């Protein structure tokens, strides 16, 4: 019985130490998600207005450009998947990967060859384990992405969209990331970045019936779109990176809170078992003492007779 009590005490100490770690990780994630939320709020208006500017230019000109012109028969698409470098975030990475795989299957059914680009070690590990081809990968900055990181990710994608498909280019650019809705809700979504669907953009921004201004372009609308293309792709990827970072921190906070709560419940259960074992040990000792005293009394009574 004493050995069993020692086992319970050892497990209580172990779970208590784990609880301290998960509580600390929960608090760290909570502080990081607040910072990430602020960055998302700061970057979203810029991305929205830049998209609106591209829409205005595309609507006001008849120029054929990768930003606004769809291929007659698209044959190749690039998919950018955003995951995290670290785990301990519940279903955060698996949901994004699942959404990317569903998008890839749909594009392939429609006759497109898919080139996959991945941000985050978790997504890369998933694809490498299954021996799936990855054109390019990026890692090391998913917790706190910067605009420079977004530019690094965007560079090969912009190069691919500007190339002809016969030279290894793509007709479409899609992105899969986790949208931050609230502290309790994060949703894996896929979005087509290029070519830009002018009607969808107007509907999303609530400007469907808005009359966009007419512009005179110097030197030309094509040159303006050439200048806007990298800015547009970089800003959208940067916003998606920030959304994914905020979602990852929120998922980590939720997972660590659940782990902390479970550790507390396990400690309570082990404490009850330890108390029961201690009580049983005390009861057994009392029974042995009483039994010994009774036997001694009987022996003394026999000797007196």
From Swiss-Prot:
Alphabetical keyword list: ATP synthesis, Cell membrane, CF(1), Hydrogen ion transport, Ion transport, Membrane, Transport
Tree of life domain: Bacteria
Keyword Hydrolase among UniProt keywords: no
Gene Ontology biological-process entries: proton motive force-driven ATP synthesis; proton motive force-driven plasma membrane ATP synthesis
Any GO MF annotation of the entry: proton-transporting ATP synthase activity, rotational mechanism
A Pfam family this chain is assigned to: ATP-synt
InterPro entries assigned: ATP_synth_F1_ATPase_gsu (IPR035968), ATP_synth_F1_gsu (IPR000131), ATP_synth_F1_gsu_CS (IPR023632)
Membrane topology: Peripheral membrane protein
Location within or outside the cell: Cell membrane
A GO term from the CC aspect: plasma membrane
Similarity section: Belongs to the ATPase gamma chain family.
Complex and partners: F-type ATPases have 2 components, CF(1) - the catalytic core - and CF(0) - the membrane proton channel. CF(1) has five subunits: alpha(3), beta(3), gamma(1), delta(1), epsilon(1). CF(0) has three main subunits: a, b and c.
Function: Produces ATP from ADP in the presence of a proton gradient across the membrane. The gamma chain is believed to be important in regulating ATPase activity and the flow of protons through the CF(0) complex.
The protein's name in its UniProt record: ATP synthase gamma chain
Species whose genome carries this gene: Streptomyces coelicolor (strain ATCC BAA-471 / A3(2) / M145)
């Amino acid at each position: 019985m004493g050995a069993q009590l020692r086992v319970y005490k050892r497990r209580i100490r172990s779970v208590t130490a784990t609880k301290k770690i998960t509580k600390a990780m929960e608090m760290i994630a909570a502080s990081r998600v607040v910072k990430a939320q602020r960055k998302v709020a700061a970057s979203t208006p810029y991305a929205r207005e830049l998209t609106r500017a591209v829409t205005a230019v595309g609507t006001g000109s008849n120029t054929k450009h990768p930003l606004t012109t769809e291929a007659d028969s698209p044959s190749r698409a690039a998919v950018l998947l955003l995951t995290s470098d670290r785990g301990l975030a519940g279903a955060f990475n698996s949901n994004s990967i699942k959404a990317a795989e569903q998008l890839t299957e749909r594009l392939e059914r429609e006759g497109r060859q898919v080139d996959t680009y991945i941000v985050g070690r978790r997504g890369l590990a998933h694809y490498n384990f299954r021996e799936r081809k990855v054109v390019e990968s990026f890692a090391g900055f998913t917790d706190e992405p910067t605009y420079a990181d977004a530019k690094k990710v965007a560079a090969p994608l912009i190069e691919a969209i500007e190339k002809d498909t016969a030279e290894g280019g793509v007709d479409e650019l899609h992105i899969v990331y986790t949208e931050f809705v609230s502290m309790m809700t994060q949703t894996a979504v896929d979005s087509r970045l290029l070519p830009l669907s002018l009607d969808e953009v107007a509907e999303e921004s609530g400007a469907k019936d808005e009359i966009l201004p007419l512009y005179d372009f110097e030197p030309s609308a094509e040159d303006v779109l050439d200048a806007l293309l990298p800015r547009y792709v970089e800003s959208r990827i940067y916003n998606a990176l920030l959304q994914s970072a905020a979602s990852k921190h929120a998922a980590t906070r939720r997972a660590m809170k659940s782990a902390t709560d479970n550790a507390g419940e396990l400690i309570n259960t082990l404490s009850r078992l330890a108390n029961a074992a201690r009580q049983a040990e005390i009861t057994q000792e009392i029974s042995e003492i009483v039994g010994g005293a009774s036997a001694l009394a009987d022996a003394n009574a026999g000797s007196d007779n």
